[in-house]
């Protein structure tokens, strides 16, 4: 006989947080949003943590390299979409990883015997004004000088001059050994009023550059999420078909964390994928899995070896899985159930597996509700699709700007692998739509605003960290009438009155 859940399936919109006691310490400036991204054992630190509880969805219309960089600057992680060729996805990951400043391997190098024309051509090709001059013209050759735009004046030169005649020679450069830390390098740059600092090894070979502009950028983005080499943390999506070829390419490209992109994670296909990763990489490659909506699904993926588990089926704004197939669960109910299973699993095994709430976030206050219900972080699609940094076109419709946004199960994305249950036969119907979302400006401005609301609400609950919020939060179901009561009501708002007068 079929199993029936006793409780009605609820969404975030049906809940409110009841305020708790707030001490004088409970101010937004004191709130920390740091949260684990991957599993860890009791008493240990997670291998990767987020500085903000946000990751971007594995979607063509959301997670490109530009958004990956922008989100990492704010402290989150973008999962580059996997519904593209292996080579294209790996290249996108590599470009995002290599964007970051810090210790940068030089990609603009030239020999002393090259000419000014060669310098100009190299600058036009790479877009960089700082060019390393090495004996053999390689990125790790013996450094003999540097050429910048200050070293030559095109209008007064023929173009045939050798680089050695106008470069700044090594003896006039300030350099640092390869044992120098990033902080020490930045101090040297500051003290000597430099724009760049070459880092050389004991043999005088060039290892890296450290640039002033990257120090300035870090000051503007104190929460930026970096790996051990001071590069941005970047994620990537994989599927349950070509993982044996895709994963090695993504690891080689520098992906810090992977995630199986599937609408339904309670399947043998996901456990096979996770088993392959553990067999070939052990715990060195971090892989999230999902999506599931109940305790049983969570435990299945936990035992299969998932590093984090995504919750949600059919709750995304462009997802029509519930409509076409009749499967899913209200996001709030699913999240509460799975997080309870997560906590019990932690008590029993001593292993904490982070839970990601994927879908159903419509308003900013839904973010706080999801975190209070137990989510460690949120995967957002529509939210990020609205921004300048998403990879879609911005278009004007009747004077209003929109961004294109389509689901991975739509005909446009043709990412049937996400919705396949395996086997050779491909699905032939859509589970996502092609749509528009209102254009909202830059990622930084919007994320700052959204998280300021999250922090403010956490203070209302007397919490300064996400775990503290989950411990102290008091949630109540609301009726349809109280939902209406919660907004502006029984007044004529001024903008409406202005429209009526026209």
Labelled PLM ranges:
Residues 73-88, 255-267, 307-325, 361-395:
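Glycine-rich phosphate-binding active-site loops on the catalytic face of alpha/beta enzymes
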Residues 27-50, 57-59, 88-128, 133-136, ...:
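Bateman/CBS regulatory modules and CBS-like beta-alpha motifs in cytosolic regions of diverse proteins
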Residues 45-47, 72, 97, 120-124, ...:
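Surface-exposed amphipathic alpha-helices with a cationic face
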Residues 66-69, 243-253, 287, 293-311, ...:
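Catalytic cores of alpha/beta
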Residues 1-21, 108-111, 176-177, 183-187, ...:
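Alpha/beta catalytic cores of nucleotide-metabolism and tRNA/nucleoside-modifying enzymes
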